[in-house]
Each structure stands twice: as C-alpha cells, then as structure tokens.
C-alpha cells in the first residue's frame, strides 16, 4: 500500500471522521462497558451509553471487481441452463478483469510447465482459469484440480463454475472436501481442499488423472499448501506433460517463482476501486465494543452497502451477533434493519451459504467473519469493512510439546487484503479499529504455518506418501529441526512409527482417517476396546467449538443446566452425555431442548454432520459400529489415551498438575467439569494460554494406565 502524506489520492484532505453523536433517530444506543486493555469484553451485557469511535482517514487502498458469489439466486436456480441465464452469466464473466488476459494466459500455460499467476481477490482467476484450460490443446484429456485452503471456498467456487458451465454440480464440475465428494467420471474441473489432494497422493503418487494442478491462495502458506508445493515439485520431474499454476492474491510471486526454478510470472491487472482507510485516533480499549459502535455509526450515517467485520473466532462472532440483534430493536422505523450473518469455518454449510445471498428487503447485511473472508471467499455487496487487526493464530512450543491458539495481531499484508474487500465492486471504506502507529508496527507478512504449528500431521503425511527423510524434503521454508523431531517423537508415542522412525501399519491406517493423528489413533483404539460408536461421538464434539453456552446474563442458569450432563470422570464423557440426551429427545422438541439446556444449536449441527460423516467412513471400511446403552468409561478413556499420551499430567504433592512431557505446570480451565477437583492424573484435549496455562477437554485417568497404553514410549524416555 502506497502511503500518502497530508492528502488523499482523490485530492481530499485528511479529516476527522466524526460519524455520529451516538444517537440513532433520537434514541441512544447502548453498548457494553469498555475494558482497560485492548481485548474483547467478557461481560458483553453490561450497558452504558455509546461513545463515538473517532477515525482518521489516512490512506487509500484499492480492490478489484469480482463475480464469485455475486449471482445471489439459490444454488438450484444458478444451475438452470436457460439461454437467458447463460447469457447473463457470460456477460458477468466478460466483465471480470481476467477476461482480457484470456489469450495471453492460455499461451503462457501452453508454453510453460509452471507459471505463477498474481491477481487480486476478485480478478476472477479462481473461476475463469480452470475454464480457459478447456480450450488448451494439451488439456483435452483428463481433469484440472484446483486446490483451496478452506472447504467453504472449494464448495462455493465449484457451484459458481457449474452455473457458468451450465451443468449440474457433480457432472463436468465438482468438489471434494473432507467426507463430501460430488465428483464423477464426467468431472473435468475439480475443486478440492489441499488436504484432499494430499490424500489422493497415497493411491496415486504422481496424480496421473490431472493434466493441470492449480494451487490457489498459495499466499496463505498453510501447512497443507506448503506440503503440496513440495510434492508437486517432485511430481513435475516425473511427468513432463503436467502443467502447474500457482495462484496468489499478493505480490510475493518471486518466492514461488524461485521455488520452481524461475517459473514465469503473470500479473493480472484488476479493475480497481478506491478504498478509504480510516484509523482510530487512539487505541480502543475493547475492540468488540468498538466494532459494535462502529457498525451502528456506519448504519445510521452512511449510504447503502453491506458491512464486513473481521473478528477472531466463533465466540466473538456469536456474541456480537446477539448484541446487534438486541440493539437493532431500538432502530427507528424509518431506518433499515440490520441482518447479521456469521461466517466461520465450523459453521454448517447451509448456514455459510446464507452469507452469499442478498440481504432481506429493507435490511443492511452485516457479515461477521473470521479471516476466512480475507481472500478465500467473495461476498458481493460489501462497501464497508471493519477490521479489528486481530486473528486467532496457532503457535507450537516444540521444547514443551505444547500447541496453543492465541489472539494475535495480523500482518500488514493481511490488513491490506481485508481492506480490499470493500473495493471489489465500487468505491468503499475500511475502518481499522487500531491506530496508524499500530499498523506500522505489524509484521509485513504472516509467518507460514510450517514454522509455527505442530508438525505431527505433516510428518505422518510425508511418511505415508513414501517420504521417509522428512528433514530434506522440498520445503519452500524449512521447518525447524526441533519441530520435526518433536513431531517424530509424538508419532512414535502414539504408535505410528517403529523404533527406526519408519511408518508402520498402524501409522498408515491413521493416515487414511481424515482426522488429526491423535484423534485418528483414538478411533483405531476404539475398535479394540469395543466402543467405536462412543468414541466417534466424542471425536465429533472435539472437532468443533463447544456445544455448551454460558451467556453472561444467565451464567448461573447455564451452569445449573449443565449439571445434568456432568460426568465424574471429566469433559469427554460429559460431552457424550449431552449428545446422547439430545439424540434421545424427540425431533419436534429439540429446538426447545437446546434452549432449555443452554446448548449451542449451531455447534451441535456441526457435531452431527461430522458424526454422520465419520460413521459413514467407518462403515465404508467395513468397521462395526458397536455400541451399548451403558458406556464403558474406562474403555473410552483408554482409547483416547492411546492418542493423547503426551497430553497428560500428574498431580504433585503441592496440589499442582505437571505434564509428563516437559514438567510444565498447568491448571484445569474453569469451564471444565473437573475444575477445582484433585485426581491422580489427567488427560486433556488442548492447552490454551490466557492469564496462565489452562487445559480444556480434561478427563481423569489412572497413572498406571500410562505404562499400559504406551510402554514403548515411556521406557524410551526414561533411558
């Protein structure tokens, strides 16, 4: 982003943005009290008079036009093959910035084995380039694979391209994501997640069914993307006819070009619209409160246009959604209502699709999203962006073997991507809930995942695909040797590797289950312990956000409601109790049951989806889903301990819990059913850092189980 000092590029002077006096149609809107530090308020129900969020208009960014998601009819209607519909869609395609580069791109792809395509989110590269390939002579046989870091992007892009091709989803165009494959023998354009293409490498090491591999959103540098980059570099040496296209929305193309030995770089010029950047004058002490106030300031004072708000996670999104709905009731009748639409990765697919539909009549749509909306998806109608400048980022401490998910500042590159969402279709505005000085302190780029997260899944993926030497793999950015060694140790602890570090039969079976290694190991152990159905239920609960709600204004009631589900042996069995009771309730009463028991219906829907998919996966492999009315808690906990042997801690004489790996002092999180209790040993699902090191998803175990489950590992550590 080019900085402009003193004046904006459009010639306007820098002015203080005092958008509203806090009054909406003569009524004073209420908002939560501010906190003293810059964090989301935990007590979002305490109300005080709204103060104005003052912004300084400083810079102008640019976005680009976009079509994905702009055809807002239902998916069924979008796939209708009427002549008028096809004509309208063709006109939309021709209006995309990339359309003019059609001939040049086709020639570049034809002439080069690897090219790097750089184009803003909205240029049309994700939808159009796969279709351009159909006209290339080399691409008349086989299929093109287009990878995406996120499932929602793979699904939405496939639906859009199917509409543009005038076919049903699953015919010429389809998608493949975890547990959901809509492709067929007719499919020639296949959207899939990075992880799914990595899975295909197990049975087809050279990906022979594809004439072209397109790695989209490569700039995000997810762990799976970096793994694919390394494998693709090996594959092109074995397949001279294969074409590879690396696509990025940011100007870091040289790194990708260098990795592929000087690959050609193609820059797609976007149709740019100005985006005015507004910073706060001073740091906001409570960014969630500031977002709420800014939403109403924009809604009451600025012209029509939808609002996109970047938040850090589901909890914040749902809290702000509830506040917006509550305070919207105070809006006068002459103003449009606000339609709040959440968007996060674990949101059920049909609810995610609501984001892409137009707002209801006499409503302004406010999309509350994680960083999923930075580049992976396109939402039409956005004119205003509110950016907290924060995201939840995984960090792994290889010395202690502990991974945490913490809220951290984003990079300048990510901030620019966020602001650009306001300028895809017309001039827009971005309101950053931080000062310009804070922006200048942000790192230029986001650190690649491979340098900061647990590498256990990556190492298992490599070894299952024949890459035994994980240190000398073709990494774009090599991970630390310490991180790789910790991953090898973890995989050895759960029985995936033999004494020489080679993958064994158990490890190979784990690699075939689309779960994290620890959870995959628990599923395999459950077959031996005759509790597969119960373990699948618990794994489903652990694979998304908590189903239990604790609204601040009814916290005591929520705690009381959860008592009926509590199990003396901890959180895993507590979750199982709640899920079982829900399934036993009548279909007609389930909505009321959730409300009475403070159960998050949205999370529960995701849990049930994962449960259904996991059960189908097991049945497909011929596994018996044995279950019994009386749960054998010991067998269930032993199954999980097989995958969580490194996530255990012993009670010490001073009353503290210390991990068996690293001797780290940890505390049981207050939300746990074991909070305040002392048991000889515990097993936990995750560790989070707040004021201290807390563990969640905690279960009580017996200390003598440790040697029974992993004697090979504990014996080796003691020598």
From Swiss-Prot:
Keywords from the named record: ATP-binding, Helicase, Hydrolase, mRNA processing, Nucleotide-binding, RNA-binding
Residue ranges of domain Helicase C-terminal in the record: 294-466
Basic residues: compositionally biased ranges: 31-45
Highest taxon of the lineage: Eukaryota
EC number: 3.6.4.13
Biased composition (Basic and acidic residues): 74-88
SUPFAM superfamilies hit by this protein: P-loop containing nucleoside triphosphate hydrolases
GO molecular function per UniProt: ATP binding; ATP hydrolysis activity; double-stranded RNA binding; helicase activity; RNA helicase activity
Reactions catalysed: ATP + H2O = ADP + phosphate + H(+)
Motif interval(s): DEAH box: 216-219
One cellular-component annotation, GO: spliceosomal complex
CDD domains assigned: DEXHc_RHA-like (cd17917), SF2_C_RHA (cd18791)
Family named by the database record: Belongs to the DEAD box helicase family. DEAH subfamily.
Name of the protein in its database record: Probable ATP-dependent RNA helicase prh1
Gene that specifies this protein: prh1
């Amino acid at each position: 982003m080019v900085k402009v000092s003193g004046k904006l590029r459009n010639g306007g002077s820098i002015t203080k943005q005092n958008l509203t006096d806090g009054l909406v149609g003569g009524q004073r809107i209420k908002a939560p009290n501010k906190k003293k530090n810059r964090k989301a308020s935990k007590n979002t129900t305490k109300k005080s008079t709204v103060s104005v969020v003052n912004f300084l208009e400083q810079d102008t960014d640019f976005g680009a036009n976009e079509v994905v998601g702009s055809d807002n009819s239902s998916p069924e209607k979008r796939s209708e093959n009427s002549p008028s519909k096809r004509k309208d869609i063709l006109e939309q395609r021709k209006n995309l910035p990339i359309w003019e580069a059609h001939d040049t791109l086709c020639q570049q792809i034809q002439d080069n084995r690897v090219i790097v395509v750089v184009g803003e989110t909205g240029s049309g590269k994700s939808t159009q380039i796969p279709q351009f390939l159909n006209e290339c002579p080399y691409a008349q046989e086989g299929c093109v694979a287009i990878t995406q870091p996120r499932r929602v992007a793979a699904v939405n892009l496939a639906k859009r391209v199917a509409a543009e091709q005038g076919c049903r989803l699953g015919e010429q165009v389809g998608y493949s994501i975890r547990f959901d494959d809509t492709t067929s023998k007719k499919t020639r354009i296949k959207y899939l997640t990075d992880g799914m293409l990595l899975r295909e490498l197990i049975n087809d090491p050279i990906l022979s069914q594809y004439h072209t591999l397109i790695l989209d959103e490569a700039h995000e540098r997810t762990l799976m993307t970096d793994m694919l980059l390394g494998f693709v570099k090996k594959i092109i040496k074995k397949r001279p006819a294969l074409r590879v296209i690396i696509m990025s929305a940011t100007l870091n193309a040289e790194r990708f070009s260098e990795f592929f030995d000087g690959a050609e770089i193609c820059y797609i010029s976007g149709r740019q619209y100005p985006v005015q950047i507004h910073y706060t004058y001073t740091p906001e002490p409570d960014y969630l409160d500031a977002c709420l106030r800014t939403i109403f300031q924009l809604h009451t004072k600025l012209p029509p246009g939808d609002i996109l708000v970047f938040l850090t996670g589901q909890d914040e999104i749902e809290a702000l959604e509830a506040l917006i709905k509550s305070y919207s009731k105070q809006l006068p009748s002459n103003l449009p209502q606000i339609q709040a639409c959440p968007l996060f990765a674990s949101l059920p697919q049909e609810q995610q699709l609501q984001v892409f539909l137009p707002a209801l009549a006499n409503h302004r749509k406010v999309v509350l999203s994680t960083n999923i909306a930075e580049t992976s998806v396109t939402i039409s109608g956005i004119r205003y962006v509110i950016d907290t400048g924060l995201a939840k980022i995984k960090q792994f401490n290889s010395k202690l073997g502990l991974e945490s998910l913490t809220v951290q500042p984003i990079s300048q590159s990510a901030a620019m991507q966020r602001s650009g969402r306001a300028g895809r279709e017309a001039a827009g505005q971005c309101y950053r809930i931080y000062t310009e000085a804070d922006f200048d302190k942000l790192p230029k780029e986001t650190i690649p995942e491979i340098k900061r997260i647990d590498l256990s899944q990556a190492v298992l993926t490599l070894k299952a695909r024949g890459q035994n030497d994980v240190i000398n793999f073709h990494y774009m950015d090599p991970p630390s040797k310490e991180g790789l060694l910790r991953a090898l140790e973890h995989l050895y602890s759960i029985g995936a590797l033999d004494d020489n570090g080679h993958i064994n039969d158990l490890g190979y079976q784990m690699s075939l289950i689309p779960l994290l290694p620890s959870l995959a190991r628990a599923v395999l152990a459950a077959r031996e312990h005759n509790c597969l159905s119960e373990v699948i239920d618990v794994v489903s609960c652990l694979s998304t956000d908590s189903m239990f709600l604790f609204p601040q204004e009814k916290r005591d009631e929520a705690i009381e409601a959860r008592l009926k589900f509590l199990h003396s042996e901890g959180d895993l069995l507590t979750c199982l109790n709640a899920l079982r009771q829900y399934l036993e309730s009548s279909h007609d009463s389930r909505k009321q049951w959730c409300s009475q028991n403070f159960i998050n219906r949205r999370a529960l829907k995701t849990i049930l989806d994962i449960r259904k998919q996991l059960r189908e996966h097991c049945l497909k492999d011929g596994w018996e889903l044995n279950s019994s009315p009386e749960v054998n808690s010991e067998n269930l906990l032993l199954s999980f301990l097989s995958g969580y042997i490194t996530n255990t801690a012993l009670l010490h004489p001073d009353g503290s819990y210390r991990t068996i790996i690293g001797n780290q002092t940890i505390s049981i999180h207050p939300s746990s059913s074991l909070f305040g209790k002392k048991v000889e040993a515990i097993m936990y699902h995750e560790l989070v850092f707040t004021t201290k090191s807390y563990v969640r998803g905690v279960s009580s175990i017996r200390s003598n189980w440790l040697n029974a489950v992993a004697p090979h590992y504990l014996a080796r550590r003691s020598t």
